[in-house]
């Protein structure tokens, strides 16, 4: 589950969401993300494949999880993918009858890391019977903290789209840095995904 450890660059408020890039090639991301070049060059599933990069450097208030308002229950426990009625695996998922813009292959994998000790819990499990949007906070009793691995600062977890993980409320106001790399196997895009001006053929 834990495959390596990274050093985060200086905090500047950098953000991008599911931006396509070429795995293992930092030259495929715009200049504003180059401070992550060492991480992007060394952390990949298959070098040369398309991957999807999320960087979220943002202020988090004490007592709240990084996932924030997206969590529907007292614990921000979730899977990366949602499962829609057609039996397909979706990003986001939404509500019954809503449009699904992004589908995921079942074998999609994700790297997760952040700069704050103990702010992310991961369970060595596969919860395929997930919800439309991946929020499984109502099943928190199935995933007690004593069975979780709490990531240390900079630790990189390699997880699947159905690996239960949770954003833990922070103890003090802090600038948190989070990085997620999603492997190839993502089909479609949401309007709020960050476009990559270097890889215009993907938009």
Language model features with spans:
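Structured loops at beta-to-helix junctions and adjacent beta-edge loops in soluble globular domains
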Residues: 56-58, 74-76, 113-116, 160, ...
